[in-house]
Amino acid sequence: ANAAFNSSQWFADQGFVVVIADNTGTPGKGSAWERGVANDLAQQVLEDQVEVLRSLDDLEPRADTTRVGIRGWSFGGYLAALAVLRRGDVFHAGIAGAPVTDWRLYDTHYTERYLGNPAVNDAPYAATSLMNDAHSLERPLLLIHGLADDNVVAAHTLQLSSALLAAGKPHEVLPLSGVTHMTPQEEVAENLLLHQLEFLRRTLG
């Protein structure tokens, strides 16, 4: 089995209907597919996920689309937070692991490929930042971040949490001391999954 899908299978074993969808921009599907997110890493990516959920009634009758959780790590963490902030009508709880929250703070070799130079045109960065959406949170959100993350630095989660607090929006933050972008310690990784499971069961009922 592909190790990338192990955690998804584990959540399925716990009774969840698990859906994995490659949205516009997912690597490995050709340059035209990647160009679909040029100057906007948010809108089309999110709408692709919404479209998949809308088709679930036909694809998987057991799925309850009134109780949808979304979880992800890194870009997937960004997408999970984006989903509950901008489409809380569709996504009812989110788990954002090591999320980018403002692309201005991420590596330029990645961001400028898709969003251009912010010194020339900052509009794509402003439009895809989660900071301006903090006031919109109406769904449960769990933020997880390794404090030693040298890829997506912990400042991303800290600034989003600060913005949510300033907007009076309750949320949960799980800092991982000594952990980098991923969690190499098996015991920590296992307990992290159990924590996410508890969060989803508690918030989705």
What positions do the PLM features span?
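Serine-hydrolase catalytic core recognition
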Residues: A1-G205
